[in-house]
A protein has these predicted regions:
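Extended catalytic cores of very large enzyme megasubunits
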Residues: 1-99
């Protein structure tokens, strides 16, 4: 089943798992090297998020997907990466609110 995503604009689009992978990679790159997670772990986390999205029998919002990413990072014990992901998410929300 193809996952549908509700963007913040209200537009419904096809889910793009590469965006999750890229977001986690960026948070990982912003993390001190000794606290980073491996590319394999990033892929595993991305796959778990995709699986959880597939289990939801409806279109899912960007915020819900971001919550799933945060939860999976924390479940993996990647607290510093999760912190960077959450911080970036918060900063982007502030920018959107200011516009």
């Amino acid at each position: 089943m193809e996952i549908q995503l509700f963007k913040r604009s209200g537009e419904e689009v096809s889910f793009d798992a590469d965006k999750i992978l890229l977001a986690i990679e960026k948070a990982n790159q912003a993390t001190q090297e000794n606290r980073q997670i491996s590319e394999d772990k990033i892929t595993e986390i991305t796959n778990r998020v995709i699986q959880k999205c597939n289990e939801i029998a409806r279109s899912i919002s960007v915020e819900e997907i971001q919550d799933l990413v945060e939860n999976e990072l924390m479940a993996e014990g990647a607290y510093t990466v999760a912190h960077n992901y959450i911080t970036y998410r918060y900063e982007r929300a502030l920018v959107r609110k200011a516009n």
